[in-house]
Amino acid sequence: MKNSGLLNSVHVPAADPYYYLNTETLSLLNRIQRISQKHPVNVLVIGKQGCGKSSLVRQYAAVHHLPLATFQIGLLSEPGQLFGEYALENGETRYKQFLFPQAIQTPGCVIHLEEINRPEHPKALNMLFSILSDDRQVWMDELGLLKVADGVVFFATLNEGDEFVGTELLDPALRDRFYVTAMDFLPNDVEREVLQKKTGVTIAQAEEIIGVVNSLRASPELGVEVSTRKTLMIGEMIAAGGSLREAIAASLQTDRETLESVLLSLHVELGKTERGTTEYVLFTPR
C-alpha cells in the first residue's frame, strides 16, 4: 500500500464558521479536552452516514488549534499496515515508516481513525489494541518501542448498520477502550440556517429543500436516506442555477427506477411540477 493512499497530511485544520453542535456533545468534548491534558484519550463517534462525524473531529482540532492526522482504516488489510511497510529501494528491501508512528508521538495530536469498523481484514486492527489501551505503547522490531505522546486524542468514527457493505461489528474489547458519542441529523431550523450560509440559497429555496428532505426521510419505503451532506449538495446545485429536480437527480446516489419513484413521490406529496427533458448537444472545445 502506498503511503499517500493510507493517510492525509498532519495539519491544524481551519475552523468551520457555521458548525453547530448540540450542547450535550459539546459538553462531552470539553471534558475530553480536559482529560487529554492528563493522559491520551479515545472517543468513538457513531451515527448515520453523512451526519457530520468527520466534521466533528476536524472542528475539535480546529477549535483547540491542534494538529490533525486522518487515517483511512478501510484501506487496511493486515496488522502493522498503519505503521509502515517493506519496500524495494535502490535494489534493497527497506522498511518505510508511515505517518502514524509520527502522529502518535506528536504531543496534542488529534488522530482520526476513519471508518474503524471497515478494515479489509478484521485482524488489521490488532496492533491498535496496545496503542488504545492504558499502556499506550507498542513494540515493533522495525521501529522499536513506540509510546503515545501526552495530549493525544484518538477519534474513531463509524457508520453502524447492515446497509453498509463490508462493515464489521467493532470488537467489544476494542470498543470498551472508547468514550462514545452519537450524532444525528441537525434539527430543521439549524439545518435550514446552515444550508443558507454554506450554499447561498435564498430563504425560500432553503425552506423548499428542507421540505423535500423531510419528505424523503419520512418515506423509508423509497430506500433513500438524505444526509446533511446530501442536503448541502442539493443546496449548492440549486444555488448554481439548477432546478430542484436536477439537484435531487444529481445528488442522490440511486438507480434510475428508485430516482423516478422519489420524483413521483415528491410530485404527489409536495405538488412539484418540474418535468425532466433530455436533449443531446455537442460538448466540444470552442
UniProtKB/Swiss-Prot annotation:
Matches recorded under Gene3D superfamilies: P-loop containing nucleotide triphosphate hydrolases
Gene Ontology MF annotations: ATP binding; ATP hydrolysis activity
InterPro entries for this protein: ATPase_dyneun-rel_AAA, CbbQ/NirQ/NorQ/GpvN, CbbQ_C, P-loop_NTPase
Residues that, per the record, bind ATP: 47-54, 108-115
One of the GO BP terms on file: catabolic process
Induction info: Induced by toluene.
UniProt KW keywords: Aromatic hydrocarbons catabolism, ATP-binding, Chaperone, Nucleotide-binding
Family the entry assigns: Belongs to the CbbQ/NirQ/NorQ/GpvN family.
Cited function: May have a role in assembly and/or activation of benzylsuccinate synthase.
Protein name: Putative chaperone BssE
Protein's organism: Thauera aromatica
Gene name of the encoded protein: bssE
